C-alpha cells in the first residue's frame, strides 16, 4: 500500500507541478485544499490507530459500497449536467467536499470518486471536479505515504528487505 500511495503522490505532484510551484499565485486555493484534507486525515488516523477500519473490511461491505457510491456518482453527474458549473472553489465547498471524503474511509468507497461526487453536487464542471479531487489528494496521499513509510521504517518486524523493496519501487 505504501508504494502505491507514494507512486500516486508523485504522479499527482508531477502532473500539477505548475499549480503547486506557483504557490504565491494560488495561496487561497492551497488553503482550501488543506482545509478539505483535514477531516479525512484526522478521522482516518483515528480509524487506523484504533483498528476500527479492519473491523468493517470485508468483501460484502466492499461490494455494496462500490455499487452504492458508483450509483451516487452517476446520479450526481447526470442530474447536474444541465447547469453550468462553478469556477470558484469556496471555503464552504472545500469544507463540504472534505467532510464527504470521510466516507472514503469505508472499504469500497473511492476517495476521488466521493470528492468528484461532492463537487458535482455543488455544481462544479466535470473537469473542475476532477482537478479539485486530484489536488485534494496531494496532502492526503502525502500523509498516508509518510505514515506508512514511517511505520515500516520503525516497525520491529521491518526487515532490510522491506526497506529495499520500498526504495526499488521509488
Where are the predicted features?
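Multi-pass membrane proteins that catalyze or facilitate reactions on polyprenyl-/lipid-phosphate substrates
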Residues: 1-170
Amino acid at each position: 500500500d505504501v508504494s502505491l500511495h507514494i507512486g500516486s503522490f508523485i504522479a499527482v505532484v508531477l502532473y500539477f507541478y505548475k499549480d503547486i510551484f506557483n504557490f504565491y499565485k494560488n495561496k487561497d486555493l492551497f488553503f482550501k485544499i488543506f482545509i478539505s484534507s483535514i477531516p479525512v486525515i484526522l478521522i482516518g488516523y483515528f480509524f487506523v490507530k484504533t483498528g476500527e477500519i479492519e473491523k468493517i473490511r470485508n468483501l460484502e461491505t466492499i461490494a455494496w459500497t462500490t455499487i452504492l457510491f458508483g450509483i451516487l456518482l452517476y446520479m450526481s453527474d447526470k442530474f447536474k449536467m444541465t447547469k453550468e458549473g462553478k469556477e470558484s472553489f469556496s471555503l464552504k465547498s472545500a469544507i463540504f467536499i472534505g467532510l464527504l471524503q470521510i466516507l472514503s474511509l469505508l472499504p469500497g468507497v473511492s476517495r476521488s470518486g466521493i470528492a468528484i461526487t461532492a463537487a458535482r453536487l455543488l455544481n462544479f464542471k466535470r473537469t473542475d471536479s476532477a482537478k479539485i479531487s486530484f489536488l485534494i489528494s496531494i496532502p492526503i496521499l502525502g500523509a498516508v505515504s509518510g505514515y506508512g513509510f514511517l511505520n515500516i521504517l520503525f516497525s520491529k518486524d521491518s526487515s532490510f528487505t522491506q526497506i529495499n523493496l520500498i526504495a526499488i519501487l521509488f
